[in-house]
Amino acid sequence: MPLKHYLLLLVSCQAWAAGLAYYGCPSECTCSRASQVECTGAQIVAMPSPLPWNAMSLQILNTHITELPEDKFLNISALIALKMEKNELANIMPGAFRNLGSLRHLSLANNKLKNLPVRLFQDVNNLETLLLSNNQLVQIQPAQFSQFSNLKELQLYGNNLEYIPEGVFDHLVGLTKLNLGNNGFTHLSPRVFQHLGNLQVLRLYENRLSDIPMGTFDALGNLQELALQENQIGTLSPGLFHNNRNLQRLYLSNNHISHLPPGIFMQLPHLNKLTLFGNSLKELSPGVFGPMPNLRELWLYNNHITSLPDNAFSHLNQLQVLILSHNQLSYISPGAFNGLTNLRELSLHTNALQDLDGNVFRSLANLRNVSLQNNRLRQLPGSIFANVNGLMTIQLQNNNLENLPLGIFDHLGNLCELRLYDNPWRCDSNILPLHDWLILNRARLGTDTLPVCSSPASVRGQSLVIINVNFPGPSVQGPETPEVSSYPDTSSYPDSTSISSTTEITRSTDDDYTDLNTIEPIDDRNTWGMTDAQSGLAIAAIVIGIIALACSLAACICCCCCKKRSQAVLMQMKAPNEC
């Protein structure tokens, strides 16, 4: 037979095989050449049939199917993945999955299932993933999962499970991920997880747990994530996590925890994220957080913490994000942040702080962003930022600040965002150095609200940045004198502006009574019709303008660069997406 006849025969066989392969694709479904079948739409009210015999992936989504009869999958024994989600499915017959021995992934999520037949899964003992989330299941039984020795992931969140029977997971020895979140159970047996030695992720969030029995997690030596947030937990047993040395993420937020037992976190060397926000903590004992050499994030906002003692976080030398906002902090010990040499984000806003020690940030050499807004700060020590040269963002808005020390920001070359608005700034002559610095660094104030004078009454409501430099003198009795002692050194602010303005403000009142007749008229006008003094003032004004323009341009460039570098880090200040 000639070669061309062989080729024609081969093509004919392939065409015949292809037609056989896709023969029987239901009209309401689409069948692809990759053995994938998808059936979607509200018009589907019963299981489509016949299904292609070679189907390996079947998706039935968003239909009005309410029941799954027996033997509907007998002719598709090669099926590997079955996804029946977002239907009206309320009843599944016991033999519905017969002949699906090759099935690896089964999802029945987002249906209306209340009960499952005990032997429903007996023919799919090779399953690796089983998703039963967001149904209305009220109970699960040990026999339902007895044949799943290969199961890796079991999702049961979003049901109405009132309790978890002891032994229900005993045969799931290969399970690595178990989600029981958003159910209604109130307690756990201490032995319910005793055979899950390979479990890596356990999620128990959004239940009504008030107590976790000692030993509940002892068998979970490979656990990496434990989610217990949004329960009603009031106390934690001291050794509750001692056998979970591989734990990396621990979520305890939005509970009723009022006290952390000493040593509760002592055996967690690999932990990198710990959330405790939304609890009732009143104090932090020194050493309660440690040693945890890999911890990167510690979230403590929205508690009732009133003070921070020395060395509260001294064992967390790799910590990068510390969130303490929305507490009742009124005192921070000078050594509270000892050991936090790698901290980059510190949130202290919305507390009751009135004063801060000048050394409180001295060990935070790598700090990039600090938020102090919404406190009651009356003043800041001049040295408070002395050792944090890399600061990019400082938020001081909505405090009780009337002035700031001379040169407090001068060494912060990377500073690109400074918030000072909503403070009662007192715009007398003492504010001049800050005023002059703000003029040269206006770009760092951003585009939102600028700081506004609160007093004296003559300048109330005027912007501290653009107000006329002829401020009223300080409110003292007697003749006005230069306020030299208020600032140890005037060299850190622009000399020309501050000196000329101060000279005008503090001019002796005797000048007003000088006998003009005793002064010899001197005509020292130059070629532009101005006196030498006038020429000097004009030149000085031009120089000041050029310097101010150059500094503002440099600040803008710095700000743009800083914001790009800090964007990824700033994103960490947002509340965490826990599970």
UniProtKB/Swiss-Prot annotation:
Signal sequence interval, chain numbering: 1-21
LRR repeat spans: 54-75, 78-99, 102-123, 126-147, 150-171, 174-195, 198-219, 222-243, 246-267, 270-291, 294-315, 318-339, 342-363, 366-387, 390-411
SMART domains per record: LRR_SD22, LRR_TYP, LRRCT
GO CC annotations, alphabetized: apical plasma membrane; plasma membrane
Expression induction: In chodrocytes, expression is induced by IL1B.
Cytoplasmic side: 558-579
Transmembrane regions: 537-557
Lineage of the species this protein comes from: Eukaryota, Metazoa, Chordata, Craniata, Vertebrata
Pfam families listed in its UniProt record: LRR_8
Sugar attachment sites: 75, 369
Biased composition (Low complexity): 485-506
Stretches the record annotates as Disordered: 476-509
Parts of the chain on the Extracellular side: 22-536
Organism field: Mus musculus (Mouse)
GO BP: any one term: receptor-mediated virion attachment to host cell
Protein name: Leucine-rich repeat-containing protein 15
Distribution of this protein across tissues and organs: Expressed in chodrocytes (at protein level).
Entry membrane topology: Single-pass type I membrane protein
MF terms in GO: collagen binding; fibronectin binding; laminin binding; protein sequestering activity
Compartment(s) of residence: Cell membrane
Domain LRRNT: 22-53
SUPFAM superfamilies per UniProt: L domain-like
Keywords: Cell membrane, Glycoprotein, Leucine-rich repeat, Membrane, Repeat, Signal, Transmembrane, Transmembrane helix
Residue stretches making up the LRRCT domain: 423-473
Main location: membrane
